[in-house]
Regions:
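Membrane/wall-proximal cationic-aromatic binding patches
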Residues: 3-35
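Conserved SGNH/GDSL esterase-like catalytic core that processes O-acyl groups on lipids
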Residues: 29-35, 40-123
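A general structural detector for well-ordered alpha-helical segments in enzyme core domains, enriched
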Residues: 51, 84-85, 130-137, 166-170
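A generic structural signal for well-ordered alpha-helical segments
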Residues: 55-56, 141-142, 173-174
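Proline-centered loop/turn at the N-terminus of a beta-strand
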Residues: 62, 148-149, 180
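Active-site segments of SGNH/GDSL-like serine hydrolases
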Residues: 101-105, 135-169
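A short acidic, glycine-rich active-site loop
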Residues: 119-130, 204
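Catalytic His-Asp segment of secreted/periplasmic serine-dependent ester chemistry enzymes
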Residues: 154-208
Length: 208
């Protein structure tokens, strides 16, 4: 994969976080932001460097990055989101924000979408489903970490509309749990930019 033109050109040295100029006036300087995710947050086709590393380099964000490619929201796999949420983040770190990637892997691995629970239900979620796992994350972050949190969506070719359906459900859960949504999937400016710069994406999901 790494021999492809998109990988080589998109990961040219000029695009490394090392080449970014630090902005001391950024409102994010010194903020502590935790990231939980999979391949996009890791930088799977970008030599392990993602937007998280650019936030650290350009804006002086103090990042904690828990990422394993191919992992899912749903389930209790040792490498999965729910287990890493417990093991990789500490209340003593006093995060300013927690950001969770809305994984594209749940559909790919055949995880059940599940159903949203009533507005007054705050425990006992079916964590073997994607929506149940999301609600467990929503319960856990305020309880364990006591900070605001947000989910971000990914780019993906989605002819079956399964990821789009998950995003629709995410917005419904936002009303219950009060988290932010950074919606890249529906961001027309980003879609136009990646179309104009094909080497910016290795495939439909992963940036270079």
């Amino acid at each position: 994969m790494q021999a492809t033109p998109a990988f080589q050109r998109g990961n040219a040295p000029a695009y490394s976080p090392d080449q970014v100029t630090f902005n001391p006036q950024s409102p994010l300087v010194g903020k502590k932001i935790a990231f939980l995710g999979s391949s996009v947050t890791y930088g799977f086709e970008a030599k392990g460097k993602s937007f998280v590393d650019f936030l650290a380099a350009r804006d002086g964000v103090r990042v904690t990055k828990s990422v394993i490619s191919g992992t899912t929201l749903a389930g209790r796999d040792p490498a999965g989101y729910l287990v890493r949420l417990q093991s990789d983040f500490s209340s003593g770190d006093h995060y300013d924000l927690f950001v969770c990637q809305l994984s594209t892997n749940d559909n790919r691995h055949g995880k059940k979408l599940g159903t949203r629970t009533p507005a007054d239900q705050r425990t006992n979620f079916d964590c073997n489903t994607t929506l149940g796992a999301i609600e467990e994350i929503c319960r856990e972050i305020p309880t364990k970490l006591g900070c605001p949190f947000a989910f971000y969506t990914c780019l993906q070719d989605d002819p079956a509309r399964r990821y789009a359906e998950l995003i629709k459900e995410l917005y419904q859960l936002q009303a219950k749990w009060g988290f932010g949504v950074i919606d890249l999937f529906h961001n027309q400016g980003l879609l136009a930019s990646t179309a104009a710069h094909p080497n910016a994406m290795f495939d439909d999901v992963h940036p270079t």
